[in-house]
Amino acid sequence: MKFEALIGLVLVFLSEHAGVYSAKFTFTNKCPNTVWPGTLTGGGGPQLLSTGFELASGASTSLTVQAPWSGRFWGRSHCSIDSSGKFKCSTGDCGSGQISCNGAGASPPASLVELTLATNGGQDFYDVSLVDGFNLPIKLAPRGGSGDCNSTSCAANINTVCPAELSDKGSDGSVIGCKSACLALNQPQYCCTGAYGTPDTCPPTDFSKVFKNQCPQAYSYAYDDKSSTFTCFGGPNYEITFCP
């Protein structure tokens, strides 16, 4: 089952088992250049107080998120203010024209961290997803909690091995992102739609294997759940690192 399809059901379950707890998310940028993280709350919930911010190379900052919550984080790169005064990014742009994304998601390709936070020390679900393509190496690590609580990441720079058909190039011709085959080729066998709309009929493709071989912990395509979804109990905090 796709991660997004779980959001509504999980939030309903969590609301019926309500307690109050907050998770601290610490963001660290180990990339050589500035990254502009974006945040998006799913399931129709209210957006976080910060929906986007600047994070200089070597810098760290934190956000507090109250459970239950489900949503995603990502990094934007190659950002600037254009001649009309609008803030734009070459990868991960959310189209708001501002550093804050204001409830808008990332334009692919973008490496995503996806989470569902439980209340009352329940079970959190989380993953790193490349279903929408790749732009930056990223890692998510729980701190505290109980159970498996394993970190997950895509630490490799897939841009260096991205197939030509999937490459997203910057103004200087360098590869700054790697599109999913679904986005680049728009075929049902890559998008897991139509006759390919089940796990049995939509196996990994040569393109998704490029992502999986580089980042075995991350979702490489829609039906990668078994190896790419992680869990943690007990209300952990989380660290998100760009270019770990």
UniProtKB/Swiss-Prot annotation:
Post-translational events: N-glycosylated.
InterPro entries, alphabetized: Osmotin/thaumatin-like_sf, Thaumatin, Thaumatin_CS
A family per Pfam: Thaumatin
Glycosylation sites recorded in the entry for this protein: 150
Tissues in which the UniProt entry reports expression: Style.
Keyword terms of this UniProt record: Disulfide bond, Glycoprotein, Secreted, Signal
Keyword Secreted applies: yes
SMART domains the record matches: THN
SS bond partners: 31-243, 79-89, 94-101, 149-232, 154-215, 162-178, 182-191, 192-202
Signal peptide region: 1-22
Annotated localization: Secreted
Gene Ontology terms: cellular component: extracellular region
Similarity field: Belongs to the thaumatin family.
Protein name: Thaumatin-like protein 1
Organism: Pyrus pyrifolia (Chinese pear)
